[in-house]
Amino acid sequence: MHSLRLILMSIQLLCYLLLCPVDATSHGEATSVSTVLPPSKLGYQMQTSDKPLSCQMLLPKSLPGFTYMPPVSKFLVGLALRNALEAAGCQAEVWALQLQLYRLGGVEATQALIHHLQELQKSGHTDREVSVDALSSALQLLAWEQPGPKRAKRSISNTDCDNDQEQSVHNVVDLLPAVGTYYNLGTALYYAIKNCSDKAKERGRDGAIDLGYDLLMAMVGASGGPAGAVITAALKPAMKAGVQRLIQYYYDEKEVTTPQPEVTTHQPETGKDATTDIGVVEEIAMSNFVSEVESTTSNWEWPLLKNYGVLAYKR
């Protein structure tokens, strides 16, 4: 009986020794997966001065004051950084951010804008001479429209434009063509909202800010051909109205800050020539176009545009 007991104790001890390393190893693996993102998942994992670049650093919420921004500003910055995250291989963060964009702009419009922005980036862009100062003022005017606590508005207008962590992220991603372009666009808009015009101009170089202008035009159907019509039809009404006001503010601010050449036209009634400020002509043309977009997207066109959007942008 004593011998049998010794045998059983030996078997138990052996099982303990064999099973404990397995449990310890499995627990160790679970911990490492939850705290450290493997390089294969990061895509472009590069070293900054003191620590590796992580996907979390590319999220909009890593930018101070982003939480207090109005919906249109959040949508524009988030859309650009969403594409930067995708180009960097951060799939989990892409999906989480995309769900937030869906709530702001609508599913179909967001998908169409993601695709449209990718096409703009691939095809290149021309120098449209977009005024960063005017865009910055327009974004701030739109921000001050939003209801909310005054402390939030003060956070948005904070003029402290130096952020060492964000600058270190920029120094790395700026070397990566696709990631850098989207990141520069997102942060150019972000700094414009914060009234950091010099920083916004720096990030908007090489046409990055032009992408933002083209994106705004597509959101009101003023560019992009059929794609623009699809986007403006699918965009949530509140978001579309906000973008329309932003564009109107932009042209108003540009007219004030930029000397405009005059256009000479002949008046048959008087037989004399009349001069008109070209800025006024552009503003009237844009206002008329926006009105046409709103009035011509009738109910019977909606199913056709919706089907076109699904076919054109389903990925």
UniProtKB/Swiss-Prot annotation:
Keywords: Cholesterol metabolism, Cleavage on pair of basic residues, HDL, LDL, Lipid metabolism, Lipid transport, Secreted, Signal, Steroid metabolism, Sterol metabolism, Transport. The keyword Kinase does not apply. The keyword Signal applies. Pfam families: Apolipo_F. This is Apolipoprotein F. Belongs to the apolipoprotein F family. Minor apolipoprotein that associates with LDL. Inhibits cholesteryl ester transfer protein (CETP) activity and appears to be an important regulator of cholesterol transport. Also associates to a lesser degree with VLDL, Apo-AI and Apo-AII. GO terms for cellular component: extracellular space; high-density lipoprotein particle; low-density lipoprotein particle. InterPro entries: APOF. GO terms for biological process: cholesterol efflux; cholesterol metabolic process; triglyceride metabolic process. Liver.
